[in-house]
Amino acid sequence: MPEEGRPCPWVRWSGTAFQRQWPWLLLVVFITVFCCWFHCSGLLSKQQQRLLEHPEPHTAELQLNLTVPRKDPTLRWGAGPALGRSFTHGPELEEGHLRIHQDGLYRLHIQVTLANCSSPGSTLQHRATLAVGICSPAAHGISLLRGRFGQDCTVALQRLTYLVHGDVLCTNLTLPLLPSRNADETFFGVQWICP
């Protein structure tokens, strides 16, 4: 005798039907787990690779290196224990100029105090200029910072700018003015902020 009413909306699995389907179900679960593992391990290795590429931020804090009389407007910088609190991590010094090895956004800062400076100043001091720029490669040559001393004995400048691998930063001070050798009065630095 047939049953009356609505038939059941779902299929009832018999034990033998489940036994036939479970290997396929197990295969789907295995493939899903494998894909998730492969995807996540790829992401982790990329993050680990980034950490290895940038174990610490690229930064440099430099002191003036006046070992010979100035014959051109270029200021030469140095770093290391012999020059006090100066260092380079990432960028390197090349003939007193700073070479960048990592593309990214950098914070540049410089302060130069004139040696034997008097507050009223001379006409030359009023016109004196401190400039920081990219001097190499020549195709990228550009002035990044520029400031006049005017009536002051000190100029301090800073800015954020994008620099690329191979950029060489140069600093110029109007001749024949001499910068102070005091590390608290004359210094130059860069700090890598982000890619």
Swiss-Prot record:
Signal peptide stretch = none
Processing and modification events after translation = N-glycosylated.
Main location (coarse class): membrane
Q: Which GO terms fall under molecular function for this chain's record?
A: receptor ligand activity; tumor necrosis factor receptor binding
Return the Pfam families for the record. TNF
Keywords recorded for this protein, A-Z: Cell membrane, Disulfide bond, Glycoprotein, Membrane, Signal-anchor, Transmembrane, Transmembrane helix
Expression sites (tissue/organ): Very low level of expression. Detected in splenocytes and thymocytes.
Kindly list every residue the record annotates as glycosylated.
Answer: 65, 116, 172
Q: State the Gene3D superfamilies in the record.
A: 2.60.120.40
Q: Which residues point to the Cytoplasmic side?
A: 1-23
GO biological processes = adaptive immune memory response involving T cells and B cells; B cell mediated immunity; B cell proliferation; CD27 signaling pathway; extrinsic apoptotic signaling pathway; T cell mediated immunity; T cell proliferation; tumor necrosis factor-mediated signaling pathway
Q: Which CDD domains match?
A: TNF
Its annotated compartments are: Cell membrane
Q: Which segments constitute the THD domain?
A: 58-193
Provide the disulphide bond pattern: 117-153, 135-170
- Stated family: Belongs to the tumor necrosis factor family.
Question: What is the protein's name according to its record?
Answer: CD70 antigen
Q: Which organism is it from?
A: Mus musculus
- Report the gene name: Cd70
